[in-house]
Design a protein with these regions (language model features):
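Carbohydrate-binding surfaces of carbohydrate-active enzymes
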Residues: 203-209, 248, 260, 271, ...
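Conserved, mostly hydrophobic/aromatic
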Residues: 22, 41, 49, 78, ...
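The substrate-binding groove and active-site-proximal loops of carbohydrate-active enzymes
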Residues: 19-31, 52-69, 116-135, 160-165, ...
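Short, acidic/polar
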Residues: 28-43, 134-140, 259-270, 330-338
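Short, well-ordered coil/turn segments that N-cap beta-strands
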Residues: 15-20, 45-47, 79-85, 147-152, ...
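Polysaccharide-binding and catalytic clefts of secreted carbohydrate-active enzymes
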Residues: 111-276, 280-296
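Aromatic-lined substrate-binding rim segments of carbohydrate-active enzymes
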Residues: 35-43, 47-114, 142, 241-249, ...
Length: 750
């Protein structure tokens, strides 16, 4: 890939250096302020702004009557001074005339309440009027500005589904029925897929099916999963409708801004339609894990871009306004976190917004030009970063690379969310995030990929809690192992089919043969619910003669693990001053071998009769699956004592030129220390290494091509040795020993 070209997908956005700027709303200011803004933009190094994002009421003040002259004049002036435009379609916030003239376009919540006008995103994604008028506006803008030399990017809508991810109106009811008809072909197939004989939910026709609005108790989980799919489909249809309208008149690249691992929309499906992946992200400066949040979200975006660069569309220069308390970024953190995004693949740093609002719901959201203007230290940070980015032109277009992939699956997240059990799921991509953070803390670069993405180039693939059984993913994982790679599958994977039907005969579905094990029972810990209910359990148990004798290991929050694996024991012994132990969390499982054992090979413990009848072994896992760790009875694991907690199956090489690989199964959610120890073991088998070994606390290293980013997230200066090359920010030569100031970055080219 050539430098200075962001070949994110099908239609490259050409840049002379990193994009820098932000959302700009000149309609909120007078003409004098606009001219002053142009001066300040040039002073700060701004080369791109996004305009028109919430301008529908100005662009179409009366239905069908467009007023584009004002925005055309703004685009012309920006182009005259050399500032590119990311032109939005304005459709994120329909105007008052739509709400008043077409009240049916307003969304309805699950309780049947139609929401009102006066905020933003107040539209039903199935509304015929909204869809027609949004497509018409996008098409008219493209016809007018589709070949304007100052417009370099189309920006459809804004943060789809951030407020309204579903609507329960009568139009959506009809559209849901139509969608089901296309998906299943008949109402009887819907009945089969949803299991409607349960609780007498059978339907005689598609017209009987309602939206899953407020109900007396648990709704049908399969219906809710399809409702998630339908809602994603409807909102995606709004976006593709505008995209098609634009494409009739313009070849300029098209995007819509994502929000990281946002759980409501399947961004992997959405990304296929876009030319450029863009992201909005607002980590909390008060959160010590904020830097990791940036690494995670950036790696997700790069994965959506199929490994190519992407653009940061929104961040704040200082503080946001929407948290209960809003902390500003610390000195140096604005630049540090911006360059961290570039280290993870972004070719631009854009903000919300250019000039801080003085009215409205985002008055106290930070901007590049704060309320205090140039008197604010934020302004100096903005100018400094602009200069820094000018010096980083060689980074543009360079690619990240990794030998390790973590798989995420949006539909599995939906399935976990809507399933009635085994546990509530309120933390999206919890498993993937945990493994990604462990890799990041170890200094290991990772890619975040989807279940259908190619995996053959990776040495290690981690499949964490992919709840829906994916046969194609299992086959791809087996190829990785057969080519000498390592595959890790974790608890909670391959539990249900595509319609939330339980995998019968043992969980792990299509992965059973690869792993050599299957799950016969979930054994989750609930935490100290009962004890929390007793104000003073110790005092109460003086008289609760019966209750005090009852054992409740499930009230614990952790499980102890034991290992006889020499390599893992060595790693555990190296952690901390006196070594450490293995521990699991609240999700645990009964694991048995997938091949039959003879009577003498069965463990002497109580198991369900059907399992014993099939001859499944527990201890020893007869066959080619070996036990790496067992539950040792500590914490809440007394009933699991002796059962496998981590297993490994060696996989024969696909051909004589390949080395054998391994497939590992982790039957609990390891805590962060245990996860780190285990990942060190597995990466050693995969011959994976940190980007730069032996870095001090707080220092992150990432590579884009041959360019090395060194980011000091700590409050102390750090000294590094062995750093050789040209430091791009200041243009200095590094000859081995370097010092990086607190919350600062070095970018070194060979």
């Amino acid at each position: 890939m050539s430098k200075q070209t962001v070949a994110l997908s099908k239609n490259p956005l050409r840049l002379s250096g990193p994009a820098y700027g932000g959302d700009y709303n000149p309609e909120q200011w007078d003409a004098q302020t606009f001219e002053r803004d142009l001066e300040l933009m040039l002073e700060s190094g701004v080369n791109m702004v996004s305009i028109g994002i919430f301008s529908w009421a100005r662009l179409e003040p009366v239905e069908g009557a467009y007023d584009f002259d004002w925005i055309g004049q703004i685009i012309d002036r920006l182009h005259q001074v050399g500032i590119d435009v990311d032109l939005a379609t304005g459709t994120a916030s329909p105007p008052a005339w739509m709400a008043n003239d077409y009240p049916e376009s307003l969304p309805v919540n699950a309780d049947g309440v139609r929401l009102g006008f006066g905020s933003r995103q107040q539209y039903c994604p199935s509304s015929v009027v909204y869809r027609e008028r949004s497509r018409a506006l996008a098409g008219a803008l493209a016809k007018r500005f589709g070949d304007h030399p100052g417009v370099v990017l189309w920006h459809i809508n804004n943060e789809y589904a951030c407020h309204i991810s579903e609507c329960f109106c009568s139009t959506c009811r009809t559209e849901f029925q139509n969608w089901l008809g296309k998906r299943y072909g008949s109402v009887e197939q819907v009945n089969i897929a949803w299991g409607t004989d349960f609780w007498s939910q059978r339907y005689a026709s598609l017209e009987q099916i309602d939206v899953p609005k407020a109900m007396p108790t648990f709704p049908n989980p399969s219906q809710r999963l399809d409702w998630r799919r339908f809602s994603n489909h409807q909102i995606l249809g709004c976006m593709t409708g505008e995209l098609e309208a634009i494409r009739k008149h313009s070849a300029i690249p098209i995007t819509t801004n994502f929000m990281g691992g946002f759980p409501k929309l399947d961004y992997r499906e959405w990304a296929q339609h876009l030319d450029i992946i863009t992201d909005d992200h607002y980590p909390d400066p008060a959160d010590p894990a904020g830097a990791w949040e940036i690494a995670w979200q950036s790696d997700v975006m790069r994965g959506l871009a199929n490994g190519a660069p992407w653009l940061l569309m929104e961040q704040t220069t200082s503080a946001v306004q929407w948290r209960r308390r809003n902390s500003p970024k610390r000195p140096g953190q604005y630049a540090l976190w911006s360059l961290q995004r570039m280290a993870h693949g972004s070719d631009g740093i854009l903000q919300f917004q250019w000039r801080q609002s003085f009215r409205g719901s985002e008055t106290f959201h930070g901007g590049m030009v704060p309320h205090a203007g140039k008197a604010s230290p934020v302004w100096r940070d903005v100018v400094d970063l602009g200069q820094t980015l000018k010096n980083l032109a060689p980074v543009v277009g360079e690619l990240n690379s990794s030998d390790i992939a973590i798989v995420i699956d949006w539909e599995s997240e939906w399935a976990l969310e809507v399933a009635t059990g085994p546990a509530e799921h309120d933390s999206p991509f919890e498993g993937a995030r945990a493994w990604h953070r462990t890799a990041w803390e170890l200094g290991i670069a990772t890619d975040v990929v989807g279940p259908n993405d190619p995996l053959d180039s990776y040495k290690l693939v981690i499949i964490p809690q992919v709840f829906i059984d994916r046969p194609e993913l299992a086959a791809a994982a087996e190829r990785v192992a057969a080519n000498g790679g390592q595959v890790v599958v974790t608890a909670g994977s391959a539990v249900v089919d595509d319609n939330l039907g339980a995998i019968l005969g043992g969980y792990l579905g299509s992965f059973k043969d690869l792993l050599g094990v299957q799950v016969v029972e979930h054994a989750l810990l609930t935490g100290p619910d009962y004890l929390a209910a007793e104000a003073d359990a110790e005092r109460a148990n003086q008289v609760n003669r019966l209750t005090r004798a009852v054992g409740t290991p499930a009230a614990e929050t952790w499980l102890g693990l034991a290992t006889e694996h020499e390599g893992l024991n060595v790693i555990l012994g190296s952690i901390g001053e006196q070594g450490t132990d293995l521990r699991g969390g609240q999700w645990a499982e009964h694991v048995v071998a997938t091949i039959q054992a003879g009577p003498t090979e069965r463990a002497d413990r109580d198991l369900p009769a059907d399992i014993v009848a099939q001859g499944f072994a527990v201890a020893g896992l007869v066959g080619d699956a070996e036990i790496i760790a067992t539950f040792d009875g500590r914490g809440g694991g007394v009933d699991l004592e002796g059962l496998p907690a981590i297993t490994r199956r060696k996989v024969a090489a696909a051909d004589a030129s390949a080395k054998p690989g391994s497939a590992w199964y982790v039957a609990t959610d390891l805590d962060c220390v245990s996860r780190a120890a285990f990942l060190r073991l597995v990466t050693a088998h995969a011959r994976g290494f940190p980007v730069v070994a032996g870095l001090p606390d707080g220092v992150e290293a990432q590579r884009r091509g041959d360019i090395l980013f060194l980011l000091n997230h700590s409050d102390k200066s750090v000294e590094l040795n062995g750093i050789v090359g040209t430091e791009l920010i200041f243009g200095q030569q590094c000859t081995g020993h370097v010092v990086i100031a607190p919350r600062s970055t070095m970018v070194v080219a060979p």
